[in-house]
């Protein structure tokens, strides 16, 4: 169940930070995909000494993640949070997506549409010394452009393209993906 709150990037960063500190209790490697890369990079800025490697799989563009809530997005989030109209809009929007059928998910959905879960990670990336790699699919040219955005902000980021896949290399070419993960996480890197 997802409570009726506004989900923010800070909430996810705090959850991730607490999980690494309190549950894992040591240095860890993180693989993140899509929009969740903002949570990981922001958490790394807070606890860089406890993160060994970060692997970003087809990350969302830095420009998209830099969007902040504005009047229009706040209004949209408020409308989706309304009991009857919001549930209807959520059901129409979620019908063709992979979102859950549970009505409680609409609060997360409204937070995403309202840009509450995004953060400008360019500032987070600039100061990181953690080993970072971006994996993208060769069949999706937009992922290459997004990876280049990351490399332009932090030139030490390694970019790897996996052949025979698009937006989901971890599913579309799992063997090649796992091979790259093994190479990146080996002690020799």
Language-model segment annotations:
Residues 64-130:
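Conserved alpha/beta-hydrolase catalytic His-Asp/Glu region
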Residues 5, 41-46, 50-81:
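Flexible "cap/lid" loop of the alpha/beta hydrolase fold
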Residues 17, 40-45, 178:
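Short, hydrophobic alpha-helix immediately C-terminal to the catalytic nucleophile
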Residues 157-189:
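Catalytic active-site module of serine/aspartate enzymes centered on a nucleophile-bearing elbow/loop
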Residues 30-31, 54:
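Conserved alpha/beta-hydrolase fold motif
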Residues 133-165, 171:
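Conserved loop-alpha-helix segment in the C-terminal half of the alpha/beta-hydrolase fold
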Residues 1-29, 179:
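Active-site loop/oxyanion-hole signature of alpha/beta-hydrolase fold enzymes
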Residues 31-40:
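Gly/Ala-rich beta-loop-alpha elbow adjacent to hydrolase catalytic centers
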